[in-house]
UniProtKB/Swiss-Prot annotation:
Subunit structure: The glycine cleavage system is composed of four proteins: P, T, L and H.
Family: Belongs to the GcvT family.
Enzyme class: transferase
Any one Gene Ontology cellular component term annotated for this protein: cytosol
NCBIfam families linked: gcvT, PRK00389.1
Gene: gcvT
Enzymatic reactions: N(6)-[(R)-S(8)-aminomethyldihydrolipoyl]-L-lysyl-[protein] + (6S)-5,6,7,8-tetrahydrofolate = N(6)-[(R)-dihydrolipoyl]-L-lysyl-[protein] + (6R)-5,10-methylene-5,6,7,8-tetrahydrofolate + NH4(+)
Protein name in UniProt: Aminomethyltransferase
Pfam families: GCV_T (PF01571), GCV_T_C (PF08669)
Stored InterPro entries: GCS_T (IPR006223), GCS_T_bac (IPR022903), GCST_C (IPR013977), GCV_T_N (IPR006222), GcvT/YgfZ/DmdA (IPR028896), GcvT/YgfZ_C (IPR029043), TrmE/GcvT_dom1 (IPR027266)
Amino acid sequence: MKTTPFTETHIALGAKMHEFAGYNMPIEYSGIIDEHLTVCNAVGVFDVSHMGEFWVKGPNALEFLQQVTSNNVATLPVGKAQYTCFPNEEGGIVDDLLVYHYESEKYLLVVNAANIEKDWNWCVSHNTVGAELENASDRMAQLAIQGPKAMEVLQKLTPVNLSEIPYYAFTTGEFAGQKDVIISNTGYTGAGGFELYFYPEAGQAIWKAIFEAGAPEGIKPIGLGARDTLRLEMGFCLYGNDLSDTTSPLEAGLGWITKFVEGKNFTSRALLEKQKAEGLKRKLIAFEMVDRGIPRHGYELVNADGEKIGEVTSGTMSPMRKIGIGMGYVQTAYTALGTEIFIDVRGRKLKAVVVKAPFRK
């Protein structure tokens, strides 16, 4: 199994470790609910060094990104980040990712850990314009410091004025005595905070500084278990669950990152435009349980007559709401807010209702 600069630290802190995307990663420390509430109410630190990072450089960088991503990179100014996806030839999704406009003719792509090899091969094979590509995944580490007290803690460690970095913006500066740290106002929790990118050898110094600075605020290390419950409470999609090679961005509710603008001929554009014009047969919905029960990935969604109408893609017990919540694809007829649907849990029909995400207001 691969390791991150923090693997030994997680083990020393008593984390429950598990293989994820080929890495030995912490799933939980004090428990998922405690960690979830820590991030919502205070501040927590996630090791996300398993994520992939690709540099796209040169005079043809923008043209390349306009061909392989769904969002309009031409409108992305230097210093800002953009959520997007790689559509495949069949109208499905290769991966969802962040694009950072680092400097003129230089972009950073941050991709999902489980898809690094697939995404890299996709980019290389679709680089028909001669953009300069570099896979820096093994040369970059990443920590996400999330929660309402994140800025307060991090500001103690950098001369950069963090309050001047808007949401989905970033800067590169000194942090905890380390140079060239990318400080990004982004996250996957909905609780606010920052994501830091840095050289792996700076990892231990940065980790130590953050935990010393955050002690008065009750800072804790957080595992991937709570990362999943936090993102689900926000209705954020997870690749491999809610997004896949066979789900279209339009079905997934990602029409807002799918830009059919002039001069942007991304993979399967015509197919997705046709899908939009003809109407969708299924859509991703958010739902909360009316009956007691926890929906799980792969459970069938049925109507009142017990006929299959879709499938749960993500589900959990919401630590904040203390009810079962989930997402799943259903036939379009069942997507209106307030629609009653049922989860087939081992032959029992449990009632749920279609709601608007996020679940955590």
